[in-house]
């Protein structure tokens, strides 16, 4: 989650990133300032930053997989710590749609939607960690990045 913000800041500074796999990235998703600010059902202004369109466009050239585990609400629960993740998942989906609209290749996976239940914020410590690694490996293979 903490690595997400570092990734979003690094992409505009280099052309050496071949792909991004982000497990429950936290704050700082970059949105283009030539579009309206993203709005979710969850109040969280830390989840995104507005950037110039030419900065945002760099993300369209990098295949990206974003994965979120279980226990993330789809509507506000009144618990700010839990709701924060609902907003982040919604922001990731909005971000993916905007990047893809500009020619990008972003996939957002919410594991329960694929039938995986019980995954925490630390998928490589979960009992199905081999399945999680396989999910990531298969995506890398589909993108020709498994060499």
Residue ranges and their predicted role:
Residues 4-15:
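Short glycine-enriched nucleophile-adjacent loop
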Residues 1:
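Alpha/beta-hydrolase fold nucleophile elbow
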Residues 109-118:
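Short glycine-rich catalytic loops that host catalytic nucleophiles or stabilize transition states
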Residues 27-107:
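The feature captures the conserved acid-bearing segment of alpha/beta-hydrolase catalytic domains
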Residues 15-32:
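A conserved short beta-strand
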Residues 24, 68, 112:
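Residues at the C-termini of beta-strands that transition into short coil/loop
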Residues 118, 122-147:
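Catalytic active-site module of serine/aspartate enzymes centered on a nucleophile-bearing elbow/loop
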């Amino acid at each position: 989650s903490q690595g997400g913000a570092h990734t979003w800041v690094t992409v505009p500074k280099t052309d050496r990133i071949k792909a991004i796999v982000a497990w429950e990235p936290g704050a700082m998703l970059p949105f283009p300032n030539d579009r309206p600010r993203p709005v979710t059902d969850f109040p969280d202004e830390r989840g995104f930053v507005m950037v110039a369109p030419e900065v945002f466009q760099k993300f369209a050239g990098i295949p990206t997989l974003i994965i979120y585990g279980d226990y993330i609400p789809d509507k506000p629960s009144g618990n700010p710590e839990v709701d924060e993740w609902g907003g982040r998942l919604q922001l990731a989906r909005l971000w993916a749609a905007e990047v893809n609209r500009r020619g990008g290749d972003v996939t957002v996976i919410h594991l329960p939607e694929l039938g995986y239940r019980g995954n925490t914020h630390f998928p490589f410590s979960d009992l199905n960690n081999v399945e999680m690694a396989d999910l990531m490996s298969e995506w890398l293979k589909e993108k020709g990045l498994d060499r």
